[in-house]
């Protein structure tokens, strides 16, 4: 689960990290009131969305007067911001964060992630802050420094000092960086995070370190332990289909193709998408109904797939191991009868009660294409999608 910048900075402040006092505003009146409370004569206005690249898209701007604040809010509030990290529709802007401008001497980069290979938390730091870290890793990998945290002892101050030396820090900056490093590690573990990023972590003109930006991603599987974080969830930033799928324990990810997919098992779902691509098609989604698929969940899965107007055909690929193919078939028939599916549906059933499932489909008198092989299913789906366009 992603947090907004202002929410992330609130977490940082709770852990004693250096962040400025800012105000999140939902209308112009709140914004004008906020700048009266903020120090300085210039402020930063930041559109709050769950995506990076806001600055390049115009969603972050220095404002120098009440009129500029009013203009910025009028332009962006209630609109959608398209960045390199969003789709073509962009993300809705319901809040804008205002904070004082900082006098920056240098920009650094600091982040923490879970390294899947070592199964440990890894901190990454670079002296090239304020830019895309992927670009730094590709063009100047020697400027990206890594530290792995031993889960038995946790983050140690000496590791923070080592990173500080590599970043070219000196004097009191080294001690301050080490403190920031240790507190971030504590935050990462205690709040069950999967990503934490400060880009940039800046050195101010007074030589103090400061968290100018903040990005936090919480592990969805641990949200039940953190009701305080769960209450920060902003559903307006999420795909409504994915949110609906979550209610039914369906694993759904929207894509940009035109062939809807409903599969049981993540591996089989990925394989199904691959074979669709192999035959020249484009999957519209990843959807895993899971091993405990029921008739009701299959119906809901169909409804979610068909809310995507781009879908021109649906491919159902079920391997009946835990789940019974006849139950899936009944769910498919019920879904089509209830919601009136107008696009071709190609069904491949294999495994437990597959013959019975195919018989149920055949007796339904619906416009279903039942096939035996995955290759044939993919070919039929690709052809059907092309004919429907």
From Swiss-Prot:
<keyword id="KW-0547">Nucleotide-binding</keyword>
<feature type="binding site">
    <location>
        <position position="46"/>
    </location>
    <ligand>
        <name>ATP</name>
    </ligand>
</feature>
<protein>
    <recommendedName>
        <fullName>Succinate--CoA ligase [ADP-forming] subunit beta</fullName>
        <ecNumber>6.2.1.5</ecNumber>
    </recommendedName>
</protein>
<feature type="domain" description="ATP-grasp">
    <location>
        <begin position="9"/>
        <end position="244"/>
    </location>
</feature>
<dbReference type="Pfam" id="PF08442">
    <property type="entry name" value="ATP-grasp_2"/>
</dbReference>
<feature type="binding site">
    <location>
        <position position="107"/>
    </location>
    <ligand>
        <name>ATP</name>
    </ligand>
</feature>
<comment type="subunit">
    <text>Heterotetramer of two alpha and two beta subunits.</text>
</comment>
<feature type="binding site">
    <location>
        <position position="264"/>
    </location>
    <ligand>
        <name>substrate</name>
    </ligand>
</feature>
<dbReference type="GO" id="GO:0004775">
    <property type="term" value="F:succinate-CoA ligase (ADP-forming) activity"/>
</dbReference>
<keyword id="KW-0816">Tricarboxylic acid cycle</keyword>
<comment type="function">
    <text>Succinyl-CoA synthetase functions in the citric acid cycle (TCA), coupling the hydrolysis of succinyl-CoA to the synthesis of either ATP or GTP and thus represents the only step of substrate-level phosphorylation in the TCA. The beta subunit provides nucleotide specificity of the enzyme and binds the substrate succinate, while the binding sites for coenzyme A and phosphate are found in the alpha subunit.</text>
</comment>
<comment type="pathway">
    <text>Carbohydrate metabolism; tricarboxylic acid cycle; succinate from succinyl-CoA (ligase route): step 1/1.</text>
</comment>
<feature type="binding site">
    <location>
        <position position="213"/>
    </location>
    <ligand>
        <name>Mg(2+)</name>
    </ligand>
</feature>
<dbReference type="GO" id="GO:0006104">
    <property type="term" value="P:succinyl-CoA metabolic process"/>
</dbReference>
<dbReference type="GO" id="GO:0000287">
    <property type="term" value="F:magnesium ion binding"/>
</dbReference>
<keyword id="KW-0436">Ligase</keyword>
<dbReference type="GO" id="GO:0006099">
    <property type="term" value="P:tricarboxylic acid cycle"/>
</dbReference>
<feature type="binding site">
    <location>
        <position position="102"/>
    </location>
    <ligand>
        <name>ATP</name>
    </ligand>
</feature>
<dbReference type="InterPro" id="IPR005809">
    <property type="entry name" value="Succ_CoA_ligase-like_bsu"/>
</dbReference>
<dbReference type="InterPro" id="IPR013650">
    <property type="entry name" value="ATP-grasp_succ-CoA_synth-type"/>
</dbReference>
<feature type="binding site">
    <location>
        <position position="199"/>
    </location>
    <ligand>
        <name>Mg(2+)</name>
    </ligand>
</feature>
<dbReference type="InterPro" id="IPR016102">
    <property type="entry name" value="Succinyl-CoA_synth-like"/>
</dbReference>
<comment type="similarity">
    <text>Belongs to the succinate/malate CoA ligase beta subunit family.</text>
</comment>
<dbReference type="GO" id="GO:0005829">
    <property type="term" value="C:cytosol"/>
</dbReference>
<dbReference type="GO" id="GO:0004776">
    <property type="term" value="F:succinate-CoA ligase (GDP-forming) activity"/>
</dbReference>
<dbReference type="InterPro" id="IPR011761">
    <property type="entry name" value="ATP-grasp"/>
</dbReference>
<keyword id="KW-0067">ATP-binding</keyword>
<dbReference type="Pfam" id="PF00549">
    <property type="entry name" value="Ligase_CoA"/>
</dbReference>
<keyword id="KW-0479">Metal-binding</keyword>
<feature type="binding site">
    <location>
        <begin position="321"/>
        <end position="323"/>
    </location>
    <ligand>
        <name>substrate</name>
    </ligand>
</feature>
<dbReference type="InterPro" id="IPR017866">
    <property type="entry name" value="Succ-CoA_synthase_bsu_CS"/>
</dbReference>
<keyword id="KW-0460">Magnesium</keyword>
<dbReference type="GO" id="GO:0042709">
    <property type="term" value="C:succinate-CoA ligase complex"/>
</dbReference>
<dbReference type="GO" id="GO:0005524">
    <property type="term" value="F:ATP binding"/>
</dbReference>
<dbReference type="InterPro" id="IPR005811">
    <property type="entry name" value="SUCC_ACL_C"/>
</dbReference>
<dbReference type="InterPro" id="IPR013815">
    <property type="entry name" value="ATP_grasp_subdomain_1"/>
</dbReference>
<feature type="binding site">
    <location>
        <position position="99"/>
    </location>
    <ligand>
        <name>ATP</name>
    </ligand>
</feature>
<feature type="binding site">
    <location>
        <begin position="53"/>
        <end position="55"/>
    </location>
    <ligand>
        <name>ATP</name>
    </ligand>
</feature>
């Amino acid at each position: 689960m992603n947090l907004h910048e202002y929410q992330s900075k609130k977490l940082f402040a709770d852990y004693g990290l250096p962040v400025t006092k800012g105000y999140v505003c939902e209308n112009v009146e709140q914004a004008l009131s906020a700048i009266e409370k903020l120090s300085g004569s210039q402020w930063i206005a930041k559109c709050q969305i769950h995506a990076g690249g806001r600055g390049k898209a115009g969603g972050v701007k220095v404002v120098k007067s009440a009129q500029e604040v009013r203009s910025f809010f009028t332009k962006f509030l209630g609109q959608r911001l398209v960045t390199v990290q969003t789709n073509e529709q962009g993300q809705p802007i319901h809040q804008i964060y205002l904070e004082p401008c900082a006098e920056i001497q240098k920009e650094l980069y600091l982040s923490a992630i879970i390294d899947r290979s070592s199964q440990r938390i890894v901190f990454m730091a670079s002296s090239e802050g304020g830019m895309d870290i992927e670009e730094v890793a590709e063009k100047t990998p020697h400027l990206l420094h890594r530290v792995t945290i031993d889960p038995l002892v946790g983050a140690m101050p000496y590791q923070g000092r080592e990173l500080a030396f590599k970043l070219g820090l000196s004097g009191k900056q080294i001690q301050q960086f080490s403190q920031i490093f240790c507190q971030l590690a504590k935050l990462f573990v205690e709040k069950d995070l999967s990503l934490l990023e400060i880009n940039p972590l800046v050195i101010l003109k007074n030589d103090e370190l400061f968290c100018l930006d903040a990005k936090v991603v919480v592990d969805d599987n641990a949200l039940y332990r953190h009701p305080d974080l769960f209450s920060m969830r902003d559903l307006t930033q999420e795909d409504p289909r994915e949110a609906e799928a979550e209610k039914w324990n369906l694993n759904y990810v929207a894509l940009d193709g035109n062939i809807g997919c409903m599969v049981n098992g993540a591996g089989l779902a990925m394989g199904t998408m691959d074979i669709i691509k192999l035959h020249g098609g484009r999957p519209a989604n990843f959807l895993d109904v899971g091993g405990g698929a029921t008739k009701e969940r299959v119906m809901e899965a169909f409804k979610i797939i068909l809310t995507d107007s781009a879908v021109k055909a649906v491919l159902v690929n079920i391997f009946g191991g835990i789940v019974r193919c006849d139950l899936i078939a009944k769910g498919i028939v019920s879904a089509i009868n209830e919601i009136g599916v107008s696009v071709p549906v190609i069904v491949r059933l294999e495994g437990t009660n597959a013959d019975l499932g195919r018989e149920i489909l055949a007796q339904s008198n619906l416009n279903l294409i039942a096939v035996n092989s995955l290759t044939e299913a993919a070919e039929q789906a690709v052809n059907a999608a092309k004919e429907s366009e």
